[in-house]
Amino acid sequence: MERFIVGTGRCGSTLLSQMLAEHPGALSVFELFNGLDWARRFAPEPISGESYGALIAAEQPMVTAVLRRGYEVAEIIYPFETGRHRRGDPLPWILVAMLPRLSDDPDALFDEVMAHVKGHPPQPALAHHRMLFAWLLERLGKRFWLERSGSSFDYFGELIRNFPAARFLHIHRDGPEAALSMVHHHAYRLPISLIYGAPLDDGARLADLGPLDLHAAPTGRDPISRVLASRPPPALFGRYWCDQVLHGYRALRNLDADRYAEVRFEDLVERPREVLGAIAAFFALPEGGDWIARAAGLVRGIPESRVPELERAERDALEAACRAGQVLLGRA
């Protein structure tokens, strides 16, 4: 069985992936598909193993731009102090979060992965993904894999089409809180501000800044630095969150009910053993000892609400932007 955790981003999916990684048989794949070239990650045309290696080892320019300007991103756990790459280098995508979660020496595992995939026969990217997962299972002594990427509910339809027998667990969080978490998360702040043309703190518009070069060196006043330093309107992030929920629910029409389940982030945190037991049953996980007890120990409580910090007008605009998604999730 193929298993996926999907969500909007800033919804608790990272915690859930960490929890499921406590199962001794689990290969918990963090952040693979969301950082790959969207036009190529599931393209049907055959590609060589070398081309596939280039696909998964390419940098994600948004991530590079954020790190190059000194911002921390909690999900990026590559060991810059001891690894071969330094902060601001064009970090290969699978070294951003995936391989550091699987090995204490991600650079060495990266080299092994690259050597392995270059030997793949010409085939579509999807077949390469499956071969990579199978190799990692054998290499790391695991029994099953599950993949989780931030904002994957946005391309849920692609996952359903490409993994027609998979089961999908959707974890969701209160919309305004998820949106405000994105505002404070610079790897979300940059792309969402660019997508929706968020105004800068000084009143400038993105359209007035000229061409945006994600690869340009930071100067402090370059357009990317100015976007990252500004506080964009929370309602734009509510709109982004809501758009993802709408995209995901449209894709549900093509999925059998027994292949889909939902869990609230708040329930996972408040009743972790009960919720994890239900997730294990849905995913038909094999017996794994006391992994649920260990996983429950990872909970640190629900983050403090940010909504009360907003001025009334901002809060009303944010809640309005999120309303359609909240209704679909049964939260309004």
Q: What are these model-derived regions, one by one?
A:
Residues 1-9, 57-58, 78-84, 121-123, ...:
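PAPS-dependent sulfotransferases, especially Golgi type II membrane carbohydrate sulfotransferases
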Residues 6-8, 146-152, 172-173, 265:
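Short His-Asn-centered micro-motif
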Residues 14-26:
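A conserved segment at the C-terminal end of the G1
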Residues 15, 155-161:
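A short acidic, amphipathic alpha-helical/loop segment
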Residues 32-145, 195, 204-225:
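PAPS-dependent sulfation machinery
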Residues 34, 173-177, 268-269:
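Conserved nucleotide-binding/hydrolysis micro-motifs of P-loop NTPases
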Residues 148-149, 159-184:
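Conserved phosphate-donor/acceptor-positioning beta-strand/loop module used by diverse small-molecule
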